[in-house]
């Protein structure tokens, strides 16, 4: 293949007679794409299938983390970091711990059934194509380099002179400046090969950047879904009375009450929103395992009732336990709708709590600290 090449939608290289992709200094050929053979991906662990791991790990994570916070709570191990006193949990909450646990288990059953239907709607996940996909990205990187001589020319730089001056000391950089010209890089049968930096960048894009973007978009979808539906349930009196008011029986949140909801609300707000994020971002099943588990951890942490200074989830985002606790108080119930990851929508739509700091949980925490001393 010569420099008149492009990449098809499936990533394969194709010659296009009579056209060129930008101006290059030399006739260049694209390295060939490797062949691949697909096979069904084996399970991550021999003792449990990925199907069941995806369904059950978020439930296990929920209860392990919740019971850890519960142990801290009932043993009063870190009173200085409490948002509320133990007495408040007993006096102000309008639902028993048993009822909370019962309703959470019901929601998790609905969650598992929905997750099973979602997973069964997906085709079997295959492996064996990753090397090919990385090579496709490396090819795109090589083709993108063909624009460099033109770009440099636009700012008055001579790509030919620069490339020649770099050839002895930095041959790979010289090749990039020349528009992706690497005559010394050859593979089997004297075919063109990719530079090491091209492969490293391609692998970084494929294995890190793309999944990171998927996770970020997934989090943004969940935040958007939950913000507007959550806010609607406060604005619409009928929805609040019949569904969302159940969650607000917990004026003093605690960890395993994170998913204490009316079953209809739990399905619409939590389960369906996560399913939409999974589908839209086209995550793999294993990506879903991590995404759903991390979402569960964040949700539990936001309801834990503690403001630990060393908690990474409460450091990296302002949407934390103290932020959400404000929403559970009668003086903050019409604010702080955002959950579970960021506060973007509260900030943009001016629903972030801006009342007196004397009402905030920090005041409760100060009283607890005085009592502990």
Show which residues each predicted segment covers.
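Aromatic-acidic/polar surface patches that form glycan- and anion
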Residues: 53, 57, 214, 218, ...
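Cytosolic/stromal cytosol-facing helical appendages immediately following the last transmembrane segment
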Residues: 2-44, 48-52, 69-92, 235-373
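Extreme N-terminal flexible tails
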Residues: 1-197
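Hydrophobic transmembrane alpha-helical segments that form the core helix bundle
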Residues: 115, 119-239, 253-320, 365
